[in-house]
Amino acid sequence: MEGIREGNQIRGKHFRFTVLTERLLRLEYSEKDCFVDGESQMVVNRSFPPAEFHWEEGKQGEGILRTKYLRLIYKGGAFSSENLRIFVSGDAGNTSALWHYGDKIESLKGTARTLDGINGALPLGEGIVSRQLFSVLDDSKSMLYHEDKFFVREDPEAIDLYFFAYGTDYKTALKDFFHLSGDVPLLPRYTLGNWWSRYFVYSEESYLELMDRFREENIPFQVAVIDMDWHITRVPEKYGTGWTGYSWNRELFPDPPRFLKALKDRGMECTLNVHPADGVRAFEDCYPAFAEFMGVNQKEEEPVLFDLLDEKFREGYFRFMHHPMEKDGVDFWWIDWQQGENSGMKGLDPLWMLNHYHYEDNKGENGEKRGLILSRYAGSGSHRYPIGFSGDTVISWESLDFQPYFTATASNIGYGWWSHDIGGHMWGVRDDSLFTRWVQLGVFSPIMRLHSTNNAFNGKEPWKYSRDAEAVSKNFLRLRKALVPYLYTMNYLAHVERRPLILPLYYEEKPWEGLYDYKNEYYFGTELLCAPITEKEDPVSGLGKVKAWLPEGRWVDFFTGEKLTGGRELELYRSLESIPVLAKEGTILPLDGREEGNAVDAPELMELHIFSGADGSFCLAEDEHEYADFQKEDWAFTGFSLRHTSRGGLVEEVLHISPVEGNENALPKERLFLLHLRGVSSLEGLSLTYGDTELPVEIGEYLEEEDALLLSLPAWDGKEGICLRYRYSQEKREEQELKLLENRIFKLLERAQISYDEKTRIYACLEDLGKKSRAEILGAVYSRCSSESLRGALVEALSASGV
């Protein structure tokens, strides 16, 4: 097979192979020899470091391309299963997979355009990682892009494939995909807090009254989402429906700039819902200027038809329809496109155009701000236009159960910033437990946006639910705001290190067959492992359950303080108050310590949750200006490290906080640290130095509910390093853990809807704690407990650290 090597390419008769990396090939075939070097919708960068490969002619004239990880054999002619195949090497270098052109790809899936009207699961598109050890992305039909315009390919029959042969090295596959398809942009910090959204006829007065009620209840919100009733919806019949609208309803919002400023004064940004499909009709405020600009007949009330392919319309679309409202205070747009995939240009999805042009326009005239939209997924490459709106889900346990998997799997195609209708959108029945579990999932999702449809009974205000549901949902919404320093660091890592916030289990642990079965378990950033509960509580035990895999190591439940030994499967049981969110021993988790208000800027008071028991580290990332493009000089980095040693019955741990590196203006002039020493109940020794100066430490209370001792550190200016050294008794710690176990079991029994005598018999088994083996105690508990769910919870508690 004759092929000419040019750099990283092999070109021959009607074909071109490009070796992007030793594991990533581009395969092109065009009878017209029309090969694409420019950008497409999916691909924006094919410039990779040089990769080592060999091209040779085989004994039967076939072309053979070899890298360290794969071997391609091509016999010439139009690609087919007979003439093109690739052998893929496993991680150990042995041939372990074979692909023929046209073979069905069984990847670990990617994501879908929308969850509109879905009750439960739906089929997902393909991703770039696979248990087959390879995957293929087809870029043949995507549009080409140049100088802000989209074009069809010269040869519409050309084949343009990307072959990913990364074995189980899923992280590298994802990083190279981002290199190829563009990095995930940085999000504004406020987006990582809470969003209030509801399809409901609000007025300026009623909306602000609600925001003030949230403030009185100490429920923080950072984003106000105004659904379609902000604009005129009741229009004369001759104009059609009222779904499309760009004129404020002055009966409801008489002074829009005043309303938007009032939201800003409350610490909230604002997005408006738009359905742009009907263009601009004669009743719109912007019609005269836009109609004159477009040259349509105003006397006949000729509409300005929606056509993003028309460059002039596109200019006016933003100039007359959006920019004036942005000047009044609208921050970004919720693009609610539901009119299909026909744009008038074959292969070009109008949703893609809307996402692209809206995102780019939202950056500002000089591209100085971070672009932002809320819109549906439009295919591979959509990660460049965050944030994703997953659509109008059905309110059901089935929908909730699908969402963790749906969110995590989207990372397999780089789509890391989904925003779901938390609590569900429509239909369904009221279920306070379902609402609460959905809020808990939302707090540990990329974006936390409560939403519901236009139904007077379907609101997501916490006080509309039972007392327990109200209390729990409020606490979780407050926690979401507290998580912003951690989430903003993950935002930085998603952009700079190409690591999405949410990752399935199989990214962090060497995959084995059963690992893929834990579909609803995922990593939430670098430090937390989440296993949300997506089923209703058992009526006897009052507990929800999730089956989870715990990777090797010792894990601590963020909410309960329970310690769990990894390397095994567990059934985890939790009351409505919490879900399993686990941190490994040694984890350092930074939280915003402010208890009131909507502000999410870099906090003066920071809580550090230090999970005792192992070495660990964390680097906090903060910036000053939130520039659109990453500028390292604008960022500040604070390093935290924990060193753990144990000797002679004493445990010693040393926490180091490094001097701030980078832009000191990204932090407050002084910062206070409130430490939660998780897994520590009392101290035998304590010392603190800032630089070379020894300072006092304020020892606070011990919080049994999270098994944490509180310490308050003096104000810190970031210029000197902090060294905190503390010691505790291993014997006392073991005694405390037994006490915590007894209390945990007592609460399980106290809650259970079983006879008092049965509770007493079960609790009597604990008299032998510390005397008999856990296996013997478990056997006794098992024989005395009639409830399967309660038995499971007791087994979890008693075997938490291994039997």
Each PLM stretch: what is its role?
Residues 86-87, 95-100, 220-473, 506-512, ...:
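Aromatic- and carboxylate-enriched substrate-binding clefts and catalytic-loop regions
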Residues 1-36, 55-74, 79-81, 91-94, ...:
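Mature N-terminal, pre-catalytic/accessory segment of carbohydrate-active enzymes
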Residues 61-63, 70-71, 699-723:
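A surface-exposed beta-strand-loop module
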Residues 9, 19, 32-34, 51-191, ...:
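Catalytic and substrate-binding clefts that recognize carbohydrates or anionic sugar/phosphate headgroups
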Residues 39-53, 294-297, 556-576, 687-712:
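Solvent-exposed beta-strand/loop surfaces of large extracellular or lumenal domains
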Residues 16, 24, 64, 71, ...:
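Beta-sheet entry/capping signal
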Residues 359, 380-388, 402-406, 410-420, ...:
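Catalytic core of carbohydrate-active enzymes
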Residues 1-42, 47-49, 499-507, 513-521, ...:
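Extracellular/luminal recognition modules and glycoprotein regions
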